[in-house]
Amino acid sequence: MLVQGNRPRQLHWYHAGPMLFGDWGTSRLYVLGLCFFHAQHSSLWFMLAMSALLIGVGWAYSIICRLYPDGGGVYSSARHKSQSLAVFGALLLGADYVVTAALSALDAFHYVDLPFLSPAVWAALSIAVLGILNIFGPTKAGAAALVAAVLTVIFSSVIGFAAVPSLAHSKITALSGSPTSWWSQFTGIILAISGVEAVANMTGIMVEPVEKTARRAIWPVLIEIVVLNLILTLAMSAMPNSAFTENLSEEIIHTMEEEKTPEEEKPYRAHRDDMLKVLASHYVGETFAKVAAVVFALLLLSAVNTAVTDLVSIQYMMARDHELPNMFAGLNKWGMPFVPLVISVLVPLFTVLLVPDVGHLADLYAIGVVGAVAVNLGSCVTTLGLPLKTWERTAMSVLAVLMLAIWFTIAYEKPHALAFAGAIVAVGLTTRWLTHQRKVREVISGTVATIGGTVTSIGQLIEQAGSAGPVENTTHQVRFLVATQGSPKLVQFALDQAKSFHAEVLFLFVRHIAVPMLGPAHRPNIANDPDAQKAAEQIKQMGEAAGVPVRFLYTVADNISETIVDFAVTYGVSQVIIGTSKRGTLWRTMKGDVIQGVAQHLPERTQLLIHA
């Protein structure tokens, strides 16, 4: 029997909120400095305008989460309009993730000033190390990211509270220049919206009702970002200019000399890349600032890791949907798509080496995220079948037009950013076209391989069991669930056990994938999994020989233990049988112990039998 591999909905708002902050809130670490650099003592007006936009975008994404409870990211929502539009939006989001990884890594090493190498080289090395770790598909990285996010909120709040007595002394100047220049400066800090797509991608695993969970996750994070950004902007404006140019590192002095920064602009350029660190030092103390800088750097590095895995996920999902070659969907033994991982590491790595400047990376950053958000909003408001109220559709349409205006402004004023995003989109669309052409040629020439004997047998199993979905235990027959990838000893042991109890055996084959799924779960396709086909045929033959009724369940999941428990509960089994793992200490360290995870969450009425 072939069943849908739905992911368990276990993500509560108090889990999703810190995860969202880890993506969305990270931008504070470079947006504040960029705002002060571009707008100087007029920064407050631009931050107020950005706060209004953040509130609007946050509200819009709470609506998107309601509309798409199984995944509302740009790739998922745009597919309702056009698959080509979905691919275009996904590639823009991919460009965003490339620069997220490069910029976050670079800024991390501006906050912690390490010796011997430049921040760009340290950033490249950190991306490479994270890439190596991701070969093993670590599942515990999320917990570390949550800790870093919570600590960042605490440290940022301490800085904000310490600065409150000085806010009355903030030097706020009127806007100078023309409205055109104001608009240009505003688009320079638009990357503050980056990370909002994360919440839409989480809806597929959110606790129902998804609308309520998403709303509770979004609004506390949004309020924290808006309020603290405004307080910290006032805190920047309250500091004397001399405080920004004290005790500068040799590297910053050298950089400003190379850039020929005018003397009057040095206070605004000096800490563009580590503004929160200098605020911590000025308002709290040097020791606190050093500790805070490490925490901020860890959050930035966790953002690098998230961007890399999300970039892998985009490529994997497109390959799964036959938009990229099949090799992009190939998993290593750790459940990680290897080819997408290599690309997701090398592209940001070379980006940060070729563009070793936070300001220039910020230019590249903005065009990707703004484009992805514009496509997502535009897809929603133009899909007339969606249950949107008139005022909701109107407000989201205004936001979509605004995002498009910002996108075209960036494309016009920063042609290098357009060229960067265009190159990524062009490579992606070309690869997609070649993939489609190859499939067409295969069909025409008759080279598409027909699924033979093994899959025929699986087809018989499917016909006997019916279509996907849990089979109700109407006969109250005893059921065992066996989690296996085809171990003959474990299969035979389970059949012997079942024969003694006159039980039916459900054999569960879990194909592990170690990347987040940025969209609704698709029906697992066993036709693309030769190992599962072989296991299904072997189990069918052994079951017939033993005279025991068997069913074969196949799914793809990112958490093996949770999936086993979910199937055990869904199918009402009385016993779960698992073999001892041959995987070593490294697997358990990176991913956790499967048996321990099952034992902790299995209902008391269900026995767990471990076969050595």
Question: What do these predicted ranges mean?
Answer:
Residues V471-D529, M542-E544, R551-L553:
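Small/aliphatic-rich secondary-structure junction motif
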Residues M1-V31, S76-A78, S84-V87, S181-F186:
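Membrane-interface "cap" regions at the ends of multi-pass membrane proteins
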Residues A144, M327-F338, V373-P415, G446-I451:
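C-terminal membrane-solvent junction of multi-pass transporters and transport-like membrane proteins
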